């Protein structure tokens, strides 16, 4: 007998418009990570189509995908992924360094991003001099540095205490009100209910969608 094919996602159809604030929620094995990788252009579907800003992702070459990941998508990870020996400012500069932004301009943009997340007084601090919540704010500032069309946050409060987690979700809500499109991947109901729309996955399929109580459809 041949190997059985395993489908991480099956018949998933989602449209997320500019300016939306969406949570993707589900238990372990539901397909959240796979969907996040597809949305973030870290993987491509074996079947079906994914359009980002009207562009069909599967037709892009490696250089085009790298450009999209750098310029169009701001990633926020559960584990922060900061360089331990670099200052907050330098960590935020990284995506700008990769795309060749001139030094003076990237420093200006990195400082502006840190100001946006309330860390103007922490620009020269290294990660070991910051709290967990401050580290995640640096990660969010890094995601904002290129002014991306989409912020993709994977379990952004997973390594934080409840107060720091609430602060991060309040910051993401503020960024959404300023016009940023944000997708949060989470298994925490409290986090999902900070968004405007929740997409529930189970066994690789969309189980249902809902809007948190008190929000207009």
Give the location of each predicted region.
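Conserved beta-strand-loop-alpha-helix hinge in the C-terminal portion
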Residues: 205-217
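ABC family nucleotide-binding domain
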Residues: 1-201
